[in-house]
Amino acid sequence: MVMLHSKNVKGFLENTLKPYDLHSVDFKTSSLQSSMIITATNGGILSYATSNNDVPKNSINEINSVNNLKMMSLLIKDKWSEDENDTEEQHSNSCYPVEIDSFKTKIYTYEMEDLHTCVAQIPNSDLLLLFIAEGSFPYGLLVIKIERAMRELTDLFGYKLG
């Protein structure tokens, strides 16, 4: 049985926030706003990292920011759950089936207000990996970024809660 170590998970999520810098085409993205591991059952946040380091710890702004993340994770989890059960949605432009080490999963992209989001179930687990980026962050790069991140989470494939 694999145990989640919060320091390792937090470090991983912080690394996923880094921007893309494509030298060959002179293109650089902003950092992700947030990276989270949430439960597929109820959308609860297990761990998260944000790129907004300007917010003082334990301030009202930090509390509001965390509350916003909680609300967004619930909304995304509900949308993901709907789409997982809707075979038509799985053939849309916002669903990207991927295979990682013979495990299959689907990456979904969504727009929430002025943000781009990307979510994927860690294969055969009760966990979702969720990225939130500015609206200018290209969906295609967001999908590539989450797929590469998933390849680093193979120890969590099959992870079940409780």
UniProtKB/Swiss-Prot annotation:
Keywords: Autophagy, Membrane, Protein transport, Transmembrane, Transmembrane helix, Transport, Vacuole. The keyword Isomerase does not apply. It is found in: Vacuole membrane. The keyword Transmembrane helix applies. Disruption phenotype: Abnormal activation of TORC1 signaling. Abnormal punctate localization of TOR1. Sensitive to high hydrostatic pressure (mechanical stress). GO terms for molecular function: identical protein binding. GO terms for biological process: endocytic recycling; microautophagy; positive regulation of TOR signaling; protein transport; signal transduction. The chain crosses the membrane at residues 127-144. It is a single-pass membrane protein. Pfam families: SLM4. GO terms for cellular component: cytoplasm; fungal-type vacuole membrane; late endosome; late endosome membrane; Ragulator complex. Component of the GSE complex composed of GTR1, GTR2, SLM4, MEH1 and LTV1. Component of the EGO complex, at least composed of GTR2, SLM4 and MEH1. Present with 3490 molecules/cell in log phase SD medium. Component of the GSE complex, a GTPase complex required for intracellular sorting of GAP1 out of the endosome. Component of the EGO complex, a complex involved in the regulation of microautophagy. This is Protein SLM4. It comes from Saccharomyces cerevisiae (strain ATCC 204508 / S288c). The gene is SLM4.
